[in-house]
Structure formats: structure tokens, C-alpha cells
């Protein structure tokens, strides 16, 4: 590899690293909401999987504890899926020119 090509590659890698850091900061600000039980349980989290809020409809508080736990877990899982999808969508622009294998997720 020629010296100029190596320098260009290093510069490109540094730019990508800076862009990844900026994207991670942006993802920390984006919130998604997962729901279950037709919206009776809601989990709001960032795209970095930090839970911000859990909202439970008061009508569920007198119900079966096991059912409520299942609904909370389902809402959490829904929020995680939405956060992952949003993150992949935002990152796809950064990785469009890279020869990455299918299904490869960034950040590593």
C-alpha cells in the first residue's frame, strides 16, 4: 500500500470514529416508546437502551401481579426492538460505503 493511500485510509478512519461518537451522542437523546396491553403499559427509553419512564395504567394495579409483570416485560422488549431499529436506521448512512458483512451491527 502506498504512503498516500495509507494516510488517506487513516484520515477516513479518524473521521468515521468522530462521526460514530457524534452519532452515539445523538442516539442518547432519541427516545422510543414500547407498549403492551394495548397501551396500558408503556416503557420509554433512549436508543442507547437507558429506560427513562415506565407508565402503568392504574386499572392494572389491582389485577394479577404475574400478568402485570408480563406486560412490563413485553413493553420493555418492544422498546428495545424500536431502539435497535432506530439506531440501525441512523447508522446506515455512516456505513453505506463500507464493505461490512450482512447483519453486522455498529457500534461493535
UniProtKB/Swiss-Prot annotation:
Its main location: cytoplasm. It comes from the Bacteria. GO terms for cellular component: bacterial nucleoid; cytosol. Residues 99-108 have a biased composition (Pro residues). Residues 84-108 are annotated as: Disordered. Keywords: Cytoplasm, DNA-binding. It is found in: Cytoplasm, Nucleoid. Residues 85-95 have a biased composition (Polar residues). InterPro entries: YbaB-like_sf, YbaB/EbfC. One of its GO terms (molecular function) is DNA binding. Belongs to the YbaB/EbfC family. Binds to DNA and alters its conformation. May be involved in regulation of gene expression, nucleoid organization and DNA protection. Homodimer. This is Nucleoid-associated protein BMA1360.
